[in-house]
Amino acid sequence: MVIIRKAQPSDLDCLVRIFNLNIPKYFHKKELVDFKKYFNSNNIETYFIIESEGKISGASGYAYENKQTANLCWVFIDPNHHSNGLGTKLVNYCLDTLKRDNQLNVIQLETSNLTFKFYERFDFKIEYIKKEYWPNNDDLYFM
């Protein structure tokens, strides 16, 4: 059974373990500090955990840039659960939640050349690309 729930401070250790499993393919080790800062800020209110078979399998959230713009943030899944639809469920959950906000006009995200095609499935469009932007020299895709 799959459930999605709000993140709790006690989830951090498990999320760090899953984050580390995504290094170096999807994240650089330097990004872990940024993720921890994000998680330990007030953004935890809009950060969600996906559990599969009673175990945390990934997370995703969003942060408001202003009343009209939100950013999808820190989407990652345990590599052992990639291609099982968990990332899709989690992103859809965040997008459905955001779409209920009548003041919101824009949902955007920053991703890489490795994952932008995943977000195109949700109708995100590439606005611009910055070459070798991320610490591991992957390109930034702003969508």
Where are these regions (language model features)?
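Acetyl-CoA-dependent GNAT
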Residues: P9-W74, D78-N80, V91, D101, ...
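Conserved N-terminal entry element of GNAT/NAT acetyltransferase domains
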Residues: M1-S10
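Conserved catalytic-core motifs of GNAT/GCN5-like acyltransferases
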Residues: V106-E110, E120, K125-F142
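Conserved acyl-CoA
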Residues: K89-V106
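Glycine-rich phosphate-binding loop
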Residues: G85
